[in-house]
Each structure stands twice: as C-alpha cells, then as structure tokens.
Amino acid sequence: AHRFYGFQGEAQYLHGHTGILTIEVEDTVNPGVNMVFPCNEIQKTAWDVLKNFDHALILRQDDPLIPAILQVYEAQGIKDGHPQNKMKGEAFKTELAVAYPDCRLVITKETMTVEGMIKIVYDLLKDKLNIVKLTFSSGVNKASEEYEVTGSMDRCPLCGIALDGNGICPKCGYRK
C-alpha cells in the first residue's frame, strides 16, 4: 500500500495496487546455455529484491504516518519482525529508497508512482542484469524506461547467470 502524501485527490489515502513488471535484458548469447540469460533466473534475481515491496507499506520519507505506523507495530510486537513474516527480501538502502523487511516498510525519497518504481527497480538491479527496458504497470498507470547497455556481463557457462565480483557463480559454484 502507498499514498501520495500532499496530493489533493483520491491517491492521498492509503491504497494498494497489483503491479506487473517487465524486464528486458540484452547481452551476447552465452554459448554454454545458448541464451542471453535464463528467464527463471531473471525472475529469481528480480524477486530477491522486489519481494520487499510485496505486502509492504511504501511511504515517502517525509510522510507523517511513518512514526505512527512504527508506534503501532511496536505495540503489536511486529516492528522487528514476526515468525509469520517469511516473504521478505534482504534489507537495502539506496539513494532512492530504504527497505525495512522485518516490518514490511519501504521508505522512498519520492512519491511512489510507476515512474518512481522503475527508477528504484533499475537502481537495485542494474549491477545484476543488463537491463535495456523496464515497464511497470499498476492499475491504469503504466510507464517504461529504456537504458543503454555498455558491454556484457561475465556469466556462468553452466547456468548462464552473472558471476559475482570474484568470478564465482552464486547458483552452481562455478569458478572462472
């Protein structure tokens, strides 16, 4: 759920959406797996960070609801997590957003719109995928952004996913 704090319209109230994100990647065809990047691995890579937005409250950093929400969470004993809170990603902090997965809260620098979501997604995934285009739709709102890819990513010849900074595949352990 989110809201447009300071907006004079329906969106000033807390409300939620179901969104669809399309990620287009580009690179050379990896000869070991005969594809640019395995589709299921794109989904897993994206979901690792994007699950922070699932069933989360997404508020702009100056929204006065934040302290009140945290106070209620504290009183309920869920501010620092709960055993049933299993669908959460790793905490992250970027220039555009900070995720607090234990309390299902994402604080953003800007009002969360489809355009804002695209900026955040790109910022979180640009070092993991060679993204050429992101499209995000939510309700009747939709936006796309295209990016220029420079160079190719070093990928595993066995499973096709990006190698880490040490040349090791995080999925299968292959070493370059």
Where are these regions (language model features)?
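Charge-rich, low-complexity N-terminal segments
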Residues: 1-145
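Long, C-terminal-biased catalytic regions of enzyme "large/alpha" subunits
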Residues: 123, 127, 135, 143-176
